[in-house]
A protein has these predicted regions:
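C-terminal hydrophobic helical "lid"/dimerization subdomain
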Residues: 61, 108-112, 151, 155-204
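Short alpha-helical
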Residues: 12, 36, 61-62, 81-82, ...
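Mid-domain Rossmann-like dinucleotide-binding core that forms the NAD(H)/NADP(H) cofactor-binding site
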Residues: 1-80
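Conserved acidic E/D residue at the C-terminus of a beta-strand in Rossmann-like folds
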Residues: 58, 124, 148
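Structural detector of well-ordered beta-strand residues that form the stable sheet scaffold
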Residues: 55, 119-121, 145, 199
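Glycine-rich cofactor phosphate-binding loops and adjacent beta1-alpha1 units
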Residues: 21-24, 65, 70-143
Length: 204
């Protein structure tokens, strides 16, 4: 439980995202990105909201394995296969899309892939412009949300932990004593394949 309590803050982002879009058990969710934000959102959607199907797209296979461990029903390396083809093959039409990869090109693709009346959540901070076709949004009556803060969601996440609805330990890949903080930072920056969350310990 000690590790879990240290991981409350990352899950507050997922709590803010899901609190805005109000997922249901009938949703088919597509998450771009299997980094910490994407993985916490997977756990929230499956563990808290019992969402019917969760699909995760990423270009790093090791991250996709982490997504499976966090509860994803489907994973796809969209650097190797067309996401549109994959969804068509599986007969899936996303009703909820979360962009946790935060690349400007994703929004237009998400608009194209979304089902009518779907919700799309943006989590990125890119200052680069993205090109979108307005008709794709209004024609499907899509709703677009943004999320950047935790919005006082700590009590919500603590409640999830107490009920056993999420498992933050699955996101912790490395632990370092604080004396080796430089090594921890270097690992986090250089090894995106195997490194997700790095914890520092302060025991002597």
């Amino acid at each position: 439980m000690l590790i879990s309590t240290r991981m409350v803050e990352p899950f507050t982002i997922a709590a803010n995202v899901t609190g805005q879009v109000n997922p249901t058990e009938n949703d088919i969710a597509l998450i771009y990105g299997a980094g910490p934000m994407g993985l916490t959102t997977v756990q929230a959607l499956k563990g808290v909201y019992n969402v019917k199907e969760v699909i995760v797209a990423d270009r790093i296979d090791e991250r996709l394995e982490m997504a499976k461990e966090s509860g994803a029903d489907w994973v796809i390396n969209n650097g190797q296969q067309s996401l549109q083809d994959f969804l068509d093959e599986k007969g899936l039409k996303p009703t909820l899309i979360v962009d946790a990869a935060c690349h400007p090109s994703i929004l237009q693709e998400a608009i194209s892939l979304a089902s009518p009346a779907a919700r799309i959540v943006l989590m990125g901070f890119s200052s680069d412009p993205c090109q979108i076709v307005q008709q794709g949004i209004t024609g499907k009556e899509l709703s677009i949300y943004s999320s950047r803060l935790n919005a006082n969601k700590f009590p919500v996440v603590i409640g999830w932990l107490e009920k056993g609805l999420i498992d933050p330990d699955k996101l912790v890949t490395h632990t370092f004593n604080y004396h080796h903080v430089t090594d921890a930072i270097e690992l986090f920056e250089k090894d995106q394949r195997h490194c997700c969350k790095v914890l520092l310990t302060f025991s002597e």
